[in-house]
Every structure is written in C-alpha cells, then in structure tokens.
Amino acid sequence: MIHNQEVNGDLQSRGIRFIMDTDGRQLIPWEEIQSDDVVIIPAFGTTIEIENLLLDKGVEVQKYNTTCPFVEKVWNRAHKLGGDKYTVVIHGKPRHEETRATFSHSARSAPAIIVRDMEDAIRVGEFILGNASRGTFLEQFKEKLSPGFDPDKDLERVGVVNQTTMLATETQAIADYFKDVMLRKYGAGNIKAHFADTRDTLCYATNDNQDATYQLLETDADLAVVVGGYNSSNTSHIVELCERKFPTYFINSDSEIKSSEEIHHFDYPNKRKLVTRDFLPEKTPVRIVLTSGASCPDTLVDRVMLRLLDFFPAARPVESLMQEW
C-alpha cells in the first residue's frame, strides 16, 4: 500500500494480499482476480493498463482507490500539458510504482519521457541543443519513452513533473535546467512557447518534510535517526540529507534499537543491513535528530522516541514536555 514494512505487515496480518511487489513482479496471477474481489489501488496509484484490466473483469476500481491526491494532481497537470501540446518530462525512478503510473497517465495525452536525475536531464538537453545524435538518445532512453516518441519534434515544448517523493530541490533544479536549455535554443522572447512552469505540482507534504530536514541540519546534533520503510523513496532522500552532516541511522521500527549500545540499521546505497555498536556518544547532553519519511506512521516515530528516551533516566517525562506545547 505504501513503502513501509510495518504498515504493509499489519495489512497482511489482517488478510490483505499483494498482487505485485514493489518492482512490479506478479505475486498473484491476474487470472485469479474475480469480479467480487476487493482490489485496493495503493497510494502511488496504478497504470491505466491495470485499471482497464480490472474494469474488464468487472472489478470496482474507484470505491477502494487510495491514490494520493498529490499524485493525481501531477496526472491532471500532465493531461493539461498534453492538451497544450507540451511533452511531459517526468523526474522519477523508472521502476517506482508511482513513476510507472504517472508515465502511463501522461502518455495517454502527451509524449512522455522519464529522467532519473540531472545526468539524464543533461543528456536530453544535449540532444535538444544539437550536441547528441538521435541514435544515441534513443538508445539511452529506450525504456523511458512513450510509444512513438520522436525526439526531433517532441522535445520542442516541455514541462517537468515529478514522482512526488523525489527531492523537490532536485526536481526544481532539473526544471530550471530545461528552462535554461530552451532559453539558449529559442531565446527569452519565446520561452513560454517552449517551457511550461509546473512548480506548483510539487507535493507539499514531501516538500515540508524535506524543508524541515534542512532546518535540522542547522542544529549541532550528535547523530540522526530516520524512521521509515527501507524501500521508501522519500525516506531515502531524508537519510541522504541527514548523512551530509550527522552519523545517520536509518531504521524501520523501534525494534531495531537493540540497546543503548547497539542499533541495527539500513545502508540504503548498498541495500544492506548493518549493526553499529556504541552509536550513542559518551557525553551529556546527547542531541539526537529524530525524523521520518512521509509514509511513516506517527505512532512508529513515537515508539522510537520513547525507546531512545529509555536510555536517559534523567530525561524529563514526555507528558510534561507535551504540556508546554
């Protein structure tokens, strides 16, 4: 449903079964899905192809549709971009469920291309400016283009949207880059005919979370603990930000904190679990940054906070602190 093992595990314990895994691999064959089954569309949304498949089976797809409204906002903007004859540039991870869904919905009304990062954006920009061949471009983006995509004509007018859990600063930097490319090719007087301003599609929940993390980076903390699903895109970006300044421990629940001397945590870049001992400094007071991904339940963050407080007997009771707020 979301990229959080605790939430998904709870759902499974209540009898929910997942049709696909997070990489789109089939867990339950479509042939097993019947018209009287309840199919819940997750927060990421789903592709038009899957929606149509379910509709053909007589499955109700709207009654249990939990697609995030900010994801739907991106789809609506992509539809408008297509109506205005712009190509939709999607900043996202090509295999992520949300990006696959956004790509499907965008391609319904506009040419669409996925760029993973600024390096991908620069490759597109180099083609637009005439510095890369058509063959090279098509090879680099062969699995990231909508059917029939023609780079010679489909990159004359572009608008950038994103997988809503990507770093907002990165999406904005990519949009700014494409605007600069169009300025260089077509001139300031023609920019509106070649570049659409789409900054209002950024998800405020993810953006607020990231902005709050930037503020935490201004503190003099001793370490950071980030709580969230290990396959959560938005949580991984929070971890990435915290690692710029603090020793950072990425955990999915309070159970990963084994004692005041041992913590089990996730090394996201290398996709492996690590065990760190003596993670708490031998000093007082200890300053800990505690934050989480947007998909992490507040109750889980509370449990982590209380677990950490267990190691500091002199700490003020949470109840008395809450009264001040």
Regions found by a protein language model. Name each.
Residues 1-325:
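The feature marks the mature, well-folded catalytic cores of soluble enzymes
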